[in-house]
């Protein structure tokens, strides 16, 4: 911590670092023109940056330059149990590597506070129509994840600065919003803004509080944990002016789905957005959080709202202390982070969005930014052939387009009391008119916070949700993360026998093909009340705005408009039923300081050799420790646009006929305990078999009878044999054949899944060439020592006529965004040289790549520190 520009914070006993004074010393009048993001980054620099480089770093912000890397020191790291656990497995492996070199393994410790929330490992095996669903699902979670939870328990004692919230307590982002983020820290006599990185792409959820919180991969998080700065160049900071007010009956979900479509078209990938204007100030904190949460879906790195009265009201509502409320307001007003202080902020680009233009929306199929107005269901070819579906139902069959999963799920929506109360009121109204859930619909309610249960009980609305089959099944990510659990065997068999087009409707944030359930061919995102309505309708062929949901006790038809609650009633019940004491009741015991057990544990983990969940990582051994030649590379896959991390390494249930399923069966696991791909990511032998295991993958090399065949397939060269992807990977591993992947635009979008990079690296991939990369996945690739290269505009796999029979070399000096040469050696002997951009974007990224990745970089750093100590 520096000493210059440290001053007393008025009205407190704390000091603060005066970023305004530091900026004004460089350029008078500049601070008032800085966006919110730049002001927070400036404070971070003034407090933490090496004084020798402080002025040059601040000039990047003041002059809006992008020609110098500057450091950012996040205050916290938040993790869920999948990437958080794999990060800690990596650190445990690093301890082993340090010990093998004669070093002290106990020196490997997080320096930055790490908060790990176990929220990703519960599957909805029992739906919300089972009154004992919560207890049953938790028991199954504990049984399946005993190895993982044993390791996580060890980390609490073996590592310093690691706090763990055990399973069954909520979703990391919602807990972060409602409790963990102080907005302003008070530490060692100094007040400063909260900032954090999280091992989940939806970490921007707390941007709604004015906290810079961004999603990173597990590998980048490990770097931050070990106390290293996160180096960056000034991002694009885009102002988004929200005008107007929403129409009656429009939810925050409708708004964010419309914004996601709008912002994707405006190409804000990688940008930090700042929502401002009268429309922004009128939104509740819950509505803001819904918008900030989906930053990765519209491609932004951050989605900031300013600190204002809405922020203070929310902090009060969620049980923060009066002292903390005063600190947040005092600091924000003093440091220029209060909304009124941002009126003169200048942006290089400003977008405008009218909230009054938003209609009732869904998204789908297949992509969150594919907005689907409910008024256009018929014209889009979704709500068609209802007569056919109704006839099938009358014959005792499931209808075409059957909604087999209807889930109120995800931090995106269950952290917003208006959305949850709206769903409960619609359920109450539906029950009053005699409507019911269709029997083939697996319905569930999985709030991200235990406070949701308390305010639903306070409003006496939980019984109405339970009556329609939306009882609470968990406080966890569940269906949104692909953990929707098994279907009723009879329903599943009917889907298989009839090759039925079945769907899912969920209040989640992603609906990529194959993500939600293997037998839900497509999925649609919708607000919580619409999810309830579709459970009643039972088929996506139903025109939710126009068709009759059912008939009441008097034989009268019931339409959606008849049971949709009014805004006035929703707001009245929220105001009456959501109370600070509910949040205190939930979080005070959860975060109570418990006495240390007194038990000491070894600094080295005792790996269980038969475990399929936790295994010593291999990153310091064998081929991964060897040289990457970047020569004679063969393509593992040639891919199109929009390849997601779900394509690269899926999270959902493991099927018996998959490579991972066959491996688990050989290891003695019964099929019902295979669990999900996500839960096995601490064991590389299981997790690497998930690489490209998505059945919806389209690898353009997998040509069978003249047609590209969909599935987890690859073509072994030079034989030209199309086989299962894992068979190709094993073949190339045996041959020690270095590999390359060729892809289209937006490669790696979706979850911040480090195994999407680890899997391809373990397969032998050294290079990925694409038309564009999503930010988090690109940094994960670098963190694993995989070189990301980008085609120049107008050049791609199609213009070059690439078919996978080629071999490739990469020539040139690897420097930030340098032009390198991709040499294409065609089968006919022709040699083509293609200029490509090296997507190592900073000197730090070059250093990490050249070291072989984050873990080798960290090992070198720790060993050099030991040598000079």
UniProtKB/Swiss-Prot annotation:
Keywords: 4Fe-4S, Iron, Iron-sulfur, Lyase, Metal-binding, RNA-binding, Tricarboxylic acid cycle. Pathway: Carbohydrate metabolism; tricarboxylic acid cycle; isocitrate from oxaloacetate: step 2/2; Organic acid metabolism; propanoate degradation. InterPro entries: 2Me_IsoCit_deHydtase_FeS-dep, Acnase/IPM_dHydase_lsu_aba_1/3, Acoase/IPM_deHydtase_lsu_aba, Aconitase/3IPM_dehydase_swvl, Aconitase/IRP2, Aconitase_4Fe-4S_dom, AconitaseA/IPMdHydase_ssu_swvl. GO terms for molecular function: 2-methylisocitrate dehydratase activity; 4 iron, 4 sulfur cluster binding; aconitate hydratase activity; metal ion binding; mRNA 3'-UTR binding; mRNA binding. It comes from the Bacteria. Pfam families: Aconitase (PF00330), Aconitase_C (PF00694). It catalyses: citrate = D-threo-isocitrate; (2S,3R)-3-hydroxybutane-1,2,3-tricarboxylate = 2-methyl-cis-aconitate + H2O. GO terms for biological process: propionate metabolic process, methylcitrate cycle; tricarboxylic acid cycle. It is an enzyme of class 4 (lyase). [4Fe-4S] cluster binds at residues 411, 477, 480. Its EC number is 4.2.1.3, 4.2.1.99. Binds 1 [4Fe-4S] cluster per subunit. Its cofactor is [4Fe-4S] cluster. PANTHER family: ACONITASE/IRON-RESPONSIVE ELEMENT FAMILY MEMBER (PTHR11670). Involved in the catabolism of short chain fatty acids (SCFA) via the tricarboxylic acid (TCA)(acetyl degradation route) and the 2-methylcitrate cycle I (propionate degradation route). Catalyzes the reversible isomerization of citrate to isocitrate via cis-aconitate. Could catalyze the hydration of 2-methyl-cis-aconitate to yield (2S,3R)-2-methylisocitrate. The apo form of AcnA functions as a RNA-binding regulatory protein. Monomer. Belongs to the aconitase/IPM isomerase family. This is Aconitate hydratase A. It comes from Cupriavidus necator. The gene is acnM.
């Amino acid at each position: 911590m520096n000493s210059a520009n440290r001053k007393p914070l008025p009205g407190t006993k704390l000091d603060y670092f005066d970023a305004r004074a530091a900026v004004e010393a460089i350029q008078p009048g500049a601070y008032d023109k800085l966006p919110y993001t730049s002001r927070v980054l400036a404070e971070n620099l003034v407090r933490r940056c090496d004084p020798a480089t402080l002025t040059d770093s601040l000039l990047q912000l003041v002059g809006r330059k992008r020609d110098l890397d500057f450091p950012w020191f996040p205050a916290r790291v938040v993790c869920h149990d999948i990437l958080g656990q794999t990060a800690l497995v990596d650190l445990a492996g690093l301890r082993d590597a340090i010990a093998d070199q004669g070093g002290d393994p106990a020196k490997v410790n997080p320096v930055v506070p790490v908060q790990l929330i176990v929220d990703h490992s519960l599957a909805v095996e029992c739906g919300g129509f089972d009154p004992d669903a919560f207890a049953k699902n938790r028991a199954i979670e504990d049984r399946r994840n005993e190895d993982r939870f044993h390791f996580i328990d060890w980390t609490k004692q073996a590592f310093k600065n690691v706090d763990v919230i055990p399973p069954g307590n909520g979703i990391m982002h919602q807990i972060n919003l409602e409790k963990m983020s102080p907005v302003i820290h008070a530490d060692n006599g100094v007040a400063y803004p909260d900032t954090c990185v999280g091992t989940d792409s939806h970490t921007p959820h707390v941007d709604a509080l004015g906290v810079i919180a961004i999603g990173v991969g597990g590998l980048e998080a490990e770097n931050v944990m070990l106390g290293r700065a996160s180096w960056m160049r000034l991002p694009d900071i885009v102002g988004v002016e929200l005008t107007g007010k929403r129409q009656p009956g429009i939810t925050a979900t409708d708004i964010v789905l419309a914004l996601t479509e709008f912002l994707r078209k405006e190409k804000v990938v990688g940008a930090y957005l700042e929502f401002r204007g009268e429309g922004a100030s009128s939104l509740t904190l819950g509505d803001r959080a819904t918008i900030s949460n989906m930053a990765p879906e519209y491609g932004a790195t951050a989605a900031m709202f300013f600190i204002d009265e809405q922020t203070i009201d929310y902090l009060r509502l969620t049980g923060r202390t009066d002292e903390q409320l005063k600190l947040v307001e005092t600091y924000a007003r003093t440091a220029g982070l209060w909304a009124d202080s941002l009126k003169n902020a200048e942006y290089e680009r400003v977008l405008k969005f009218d909230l009054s233009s938003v209609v009732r929306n869904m998204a789908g199929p297949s992509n969150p930014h594919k907005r689907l107005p409910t008024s256009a269901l018929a014209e889009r070819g979704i709500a068609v052939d209802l007569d056919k579906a109704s006839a099938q139902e009358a014959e005792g069959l499931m209808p075409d387009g059957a909604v087999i999963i209807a889930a109120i799920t995800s931090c995106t929506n269950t952290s917003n009391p208006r959305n949850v109360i709206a769903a409960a009121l619609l359920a109450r109204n539906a029950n009053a008119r005699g409507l019911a859930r269709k029997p083939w619909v697996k319905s569930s309610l999985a709030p991200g916070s235990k406070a949701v249960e308390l305010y639903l009980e306070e409003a006496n609305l939980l019984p109405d949700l339970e009556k329609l089959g939306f009882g609470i099944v968990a406080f966890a990510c569940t269906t949104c993360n692909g953990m929707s659990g098994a279907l009723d065997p009879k329903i599943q068999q009917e889907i298989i026998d009839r090759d039925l087009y079945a769907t899912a409707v969920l209040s989640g944030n992603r609906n990529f093909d194959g993500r939600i359930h293997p037998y839900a061919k497509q999925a649609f995102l919708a607000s919580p009340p619409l999810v309830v309505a579709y459970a009643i309708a039972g088929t996506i062929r139903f025109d939710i705005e126009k068709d009759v949901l059912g008939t009441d006790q008097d034989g009268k038809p019931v339409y959606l408009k008849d049971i949709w609650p009014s805004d006035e009633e929703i707001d009245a019940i929220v105001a009456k039923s959501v109370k600070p004491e509910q949040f205190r009741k939930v979080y005070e015991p959860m975060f109570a300081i418990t006495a240390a057990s007194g038990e000491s544990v070894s600094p080295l983990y005792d790996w269980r050799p038969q475990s399929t969940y936790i295994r010593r990582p291999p990153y310091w051994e064998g081929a991964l420790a060897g040289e990457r030649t970047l020569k004679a590379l063969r393509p593992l896959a040639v891919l199109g646009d929009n390849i997601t991390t779900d394509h690269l390494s899926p999270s959902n249930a493991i099927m018996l006929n998959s490579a991972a399923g066959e491996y688990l069966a050989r290891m003695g696991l019964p099929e019902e305990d295979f669990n999900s791909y996500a839960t096995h990511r601490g064991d590389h032998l299981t997790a690497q078999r998930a690489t490209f295991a998505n059945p919806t993958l389209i690898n353009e090399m997998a040509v069978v009878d003249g047609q590209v065949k969909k599935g987890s397939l690859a073509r072994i060269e030079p034989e030209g044999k199309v086989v299962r992807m894992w068979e190709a990977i094993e073949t190339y591993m045996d041959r020690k054949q270095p590999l390359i992947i060729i892809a289209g635009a937006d490669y790696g979008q979706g979850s911040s899944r480090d195994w999407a990079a680890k899997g391809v690296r373990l397969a032998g991939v050294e290079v990925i060439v694409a038309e564009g990369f999503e930010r988090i996945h690109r940094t994960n690739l670098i963190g694993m020592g995989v070189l990301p290269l980008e085609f120049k505009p107008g050049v791609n796999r199609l213009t070059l006529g690439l078919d996978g029979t080629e071999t490739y070399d990469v020539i040139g000096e690897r420097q930030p965004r340098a032009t390198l040469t991709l040499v294409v050696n065609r089968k006919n002997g022709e040699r083509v040289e293609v200029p490509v951009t090296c997507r190592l974007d900073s000197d730090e990224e070059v250093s990490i790549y050249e070291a072989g990745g984050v873990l080798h970089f960290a090992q070198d750093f720790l060993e050099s520190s030991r040598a000079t100590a």
